[in-house]
A protein has these predicted regions:
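N-terminal helix-turn-helix
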Residues: 1-76
């Protein structure tokens, strides 16, 4: 099966946020990505509502779109 690198990277970034808000540098380290790539991924995911920047902070956390997707799991299983 072929790999889609951008999807793998997006999931790595999302996984880096599962323990709470973190900054770009920590996301990059946890996801094993260059800092510039992590920053671009976070910006793209933020536009989609999958992550959000903590108000008054430079850290990111999982966003409302992820919460909405997760809440649908209970009714579909």
């Amino acid at each position: 099966m072929s790999r889609v690198q951008s999807i793998e990277r997006a999931f790595a970034v999302l996984s880096a946020l599962t323990d709470g808000p973190v900054g770009v540098t920590d996301v990059a380290e946890r996801a094993d990505l260059p800092k510039s790539t992590a920053a671009r991924m976070l910006a793209s995911l933020a536009r989609e509502g999958a992550v959000e920047q903590v108000p008054g902070d430079t850290r990111y956390r999982l966003g409302p779109r992820i919460e909405a997707l997760a809440s649908g799991l209970g009714s579909s299983r």
